[in-house]
Structure formats: C-alpha cells, structure tokens
Amino acid sequence: MTGQFRTAVAVEARKLVASHVVRAATLLIVVGIATLTASLAAAAGTGDEQILAKLGDLADEEGWALLVGIAIQITSAAGLLGFGVVMAFVVGREFTDGTISGLFALPISRGTIAAAKVAVVLVWTAVVAICLTGTIVAVGVGGGHGMPDADDVDGLARLFVLTVMSGAVAVPAAWAATLGRGLLPGIAVTIGIIASAQILVVAGAGGWYPAATPALWAIDPANVSIAQLGFVFVVAGIFTIGTVHSWVRLQLDR
C-alpha cells in the first residue's frame, strides 16, 4: 500500500463515517433486515399460511434454521440494494456536489482516490456483515432459541459471507456512477443487477451470474462451486479497474 493510497483511504474513511447517508444505510440494513427476519419467523411460528407459502422450503424449518434461512433470503436482495446505493453515493457525490473539479488540483491521483473509495466501501461492508450477523444472533438468543449449535453457526457464517460478497457484487455501481456522473446511474444499475439475478435464478442459470451466486451458495453450498464463488471477486476486480481507469481519464469539461 503506497503512501498516497493510505492517505486517500484515511480521507475517504473519515468522509464515510461522517456521512448521514451511510449511517442511515447501516441502520436500515442491520436493524431493518433483523426486524423483518424476526417478524417473518414469528409469523411462520403461528402457522400463517400466506407467510409459509412465501418461505418455500424454509416453511418446514424451525428455530435457528428458520431464522437464519429467512435472514439469508432477505439479505440477498436488501443487502445488495443497500450496498449498491452506498457505493454509488460514495463515488457519485463528487459529481453531484460539484467537488470533482477540486480533485484535479490534489497531489493524489484521481485513480488512487477512486480505488480508495471502493476499498473503503468494501471494508464498511465487512463491518456491516459483522453487525448484521451479531444482531441475528441476538434475535435468536432473545427469541428463546438458545445458543446456536455447530450447524447453526455454519448458517450464520454463510450469512456473514453472503453479506460481504454482496458488497463485491455492488462494485459495478461505482463504475456506473462514474460514467453517469452522479448517484442515480449507480442506483439504477444496482436495481438492474437485482432484477436480472432474480430472472436468471428462476431460469436456472444463476450459478455463473455473480449477482446470484452468493445467495445460491448461502442457501445451498452444494449447488455452487468454488470457481463460481471466485468468479464473483474476479468480476468485482474488473469493475474496480474500470472505475479507476475512468477516473484517470476524467476531464474538467465533462
């Protein structure tokens, strides 16, 4: 890690921590998913037929298996949406706030700044994953399920990995926000990614689609290979490079 990159990461980290948008997103992702998970699990426990029908195979589960399974299903879409919005915001706000021109005068290259932005959001994603997993544990223990056993811990670990990988899946939002010079293109791409993932999963072709792979693996690890999981990070790396390259080529008159 170069000195310039460390400096850029430190600056972007301070900006991210101070952002009301990021704070709100963190709260909505962690508390929102945990609350919805607890509500659906409680409704399923009462035998609500409509809820049980929506849960599919999870309808036959109970306790920790039901709770973690619901959390995984919700996180697969809601987590990706939240991370995509934050990724688009962190990268796109320089354009919407009109501060992008000032970056041309800094001694740190624009490519380094772009790389730092993506890196900071990915680290934040990992922090959110820890908080979300811990909150689900608290919900389970508080809900009378006792301490999780080995199988339950495995499910919680998959929830954590799914959340982290959802951040990687959201990296294209950074590139879209750069090309579109603002927040909205990044959000639009995120929504498109979620919608396309749903379509391909229904069509049975989601294993090699990076947006769907983490969720499919979290639900049933046997159906997803290591190569398919690794491809998620390859695609994230490609879009990170694309974002950095686009920032390097930015011009003041655009």
Predicted regions located by residue number:
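Terminal transmembrane helical anchor/hairpin motif
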Residues: 2-3, 29, 39-68, 187-254
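Transmembrane helix-loop junction
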Residues: 93, 106, 137-141, 145, ...
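Hydrophobic core positions of alpha-helical segments in small-molecule transporters
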Residues: 24-28, 116, 189
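Aromatic- and glycine-rich beta-strand/loop motifs that create alpha-glucan
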Residues: 1-31, 178
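Hydrophobic/aromatic residues in alpha-helical transmembrane segments
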Residues: 83-87, 100, 135, 172-176, ...
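Secretory targeting signals
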Residues: 29-83, 115-180, 221-226, 230-234
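Helix-loop-helix units of permease transmembrane domains in multi-pass membrane transporters
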Residues: 88-122
